[in-house]
Every structure is written in structure tokens, then in C-alpha cells.
Amino acid sequence: MIFWLILCISTTFSGEITISIKKSTGKTCTVKENKVILQQQIPPRFPFEQRTRAELRFYRDMDYTKNALDYTQILTQLKARGLLFKDEERAVEVLANISYFRIANYLRYFEIDNDRHLYKPDTYFEDAVYIYYFDKKLRGLLFTAIQSIEVSLRSKVIHHVALSHGPFWFADYNLCINRAMYADNLTTIKREVQRSKEDFIQEHFRKYSYPDVPPVWKTLEVTSFGTLSKLFCNLNDNRVKKQIARLYNLPQHQVLESWIKCIVILRNCLAHHARVWNRRFPQMPQLSIRARGNWIDSTHVRPNKLYAQICCLAYLLDSIYPQNDFKVQVKNLLNEYPDINIHYMGFPNDWENQPLWM
């Protein structure tokens, strides 16, 4: 077999050589005393940080030498990079209450040089603040929707799986697909239960000594959404999983699994107040489905963008609460912020004409 490698070599002050292997793994390794030590994989950059220089570059060990700046110094630095301000006093208030680095996540959208952080002509600090407040309201809207879906899914998983496999099915390795994941899940469940301060958990342990975890209807009320997702996906009873999926008007449990995995990642972003409006998500929902309810034409939908996940949330909410106003709230928010470029969120041109949104 013929293959090729391109190596980037740089030296450190200690004489070590860092080699970046271009083709094979995308990982770096260090050559020291004729021994090659593999280091961690270089993480991918956010979409708005795509480099304009050649992809092949030198990686060096560097010391971080930047000092903290006061608000006036931050404004001076941003001005030197080409950023404009409509109200500098208000800008200082924003930095004091939101922090520069959080706003910088939105300023990067306006950069023309990601290495030197130079901004497009006629870019104002307030432009980034505008997107920040839109993103903040959007996060609140999505988080509320996910709460309803999470509570519903917990209830259905607890009820239907327990009826088929008993109150401690999550501790039965015969019901899992992957034994290693089963062990990890059980360890996580026990840890989450032990640290819970809920009265019903404390009361359970005062009354019962065996098994060492409460039944599923208590346990799954104090475990994380991520743990719930892993338990459901690792369950080997496809009949029960399909039964639950059909309660959400989904034809296959694999579709529900793919949606839940995406929603867990989205929820974590929301819980940590992370930017979501133009994020590319690593987990993508299955969109080409034979839906029983009103759905979308997914032909031109980018599954790694937020619009795809918003559609999944809307569809699930319609099955849980048919009279919900989630879609109305989404439209109202977009109307409130007309200058937001919704294409960066993955919205297609005809999204409002899709059956789901009509």
C-alpha cells in the first residue's frame, strides 16, 4: 500500500522536535532522545475561526504571557483592531456584566483576520451585543422546550421499561447492548443517586438496605439527562423502545435515539450559557423520516445546524402538548431581531412554508 505523509517540524527551547503528521492522523508527536511520543489530537476550530493561511502550519510550545486588561484598555485594543463604538460608557457596562471573553465569541463573527482579530469595516461593538442578546433569549426559549421533553421522556422510559423488565432493569446487564457502557452507566447512576439531597432518596435509604440503588422511578428522577439518554440507547429491548418512539409519532426508535443524543448536547450548551445561534453541532439528528405528524422536507437542511434541532424540538413538543406555542415563540423572537442572519442557524429560505411550521 502506498501512502504519503507531510511533516511539519518545529523545535522548542529544550531542543525537542514537534512533528505534525498531516495525512495520517492529524495528531502531533514529540521526538525526544530518538523516541516518538504521541500527543493529543489537535481539536477542530469553530466554523467562524476558519484560518485563511495554509492548512499546513508549524505548532510550537508557547508560554502564555498576556496580562489582564482593564475595561478602558480593552476598548483601546478593540479600536486598534478596527472596531467602532456607538456608546463607550454602555460598552464598559456590558463588559462589566457579561465579560469580554463571552462577547468575543460573537465579535469573531465579524472578523476578517482571525489571527490578528481584525474586524470588517463599519463593524460596531453593539452589533455583537445585539447577537448576544438574541442568543440569550433563544437559549432561554430552547431550554424551556427541552425541559418539557426531558420530563416527558423520563416518565415514558420509567413507566414502559419498568412494566416490561421490573424496577431495577437499569442494573441488569442482560438488558444492555454494550457491557462497557452498562458498567459506566451504572457507576454514574450510583454516584448521582448518592449525592442527591432529594427527600425521597434520603427516605429510601433510611428504610431499605438492598439493593444499593432505589427503583427506577426514584433513581431516574435524580440522574442527568445525559445518563437517561445513554440508558435508553443502550437498552437491548427494541420492542419497548419502538413503543416509546411511537408515543412521539416517530416510526423507529433509532430516530428518537438520534434526536435525544442531539438534544443532550444542545441542553449542555444551554446550561453553560454557550453560544448556539451559529454553532455547528458534532451530533446530527436523523431528519429523513416517515413522520406521522407534520414534518419538514429535509433535502436542503443542514443537520449540524441549530434549525434541524429546533425542528426536532417542535415535533416532539407537538406530540406531548399539541396546543403548545413553541413555534409561535420562535417566529416572534426572529421578528423581534430582524437583523439576525437566520441562514447561519441553518434556516432554509422556505422554512415557514414547511408543514411543521404552518
Protein language model regions, located:
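Extended intrinsically disordered or low-complexity regions, especially N/C-terminal cytosolic tails and loops
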Residues: 12, 27-265, 277-358
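Acidic/aromatic/glycine-rich contiguous surface patches that form carbohydrate-binding/processing clefts
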Residues: 273
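Cationic, amphipathic, low-complexity segments that mediate targeting or membrane/lipid association
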Residues: 8-11, 16
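Compositionally biased, low-complexity peptide segments typical
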Residues: 20-26
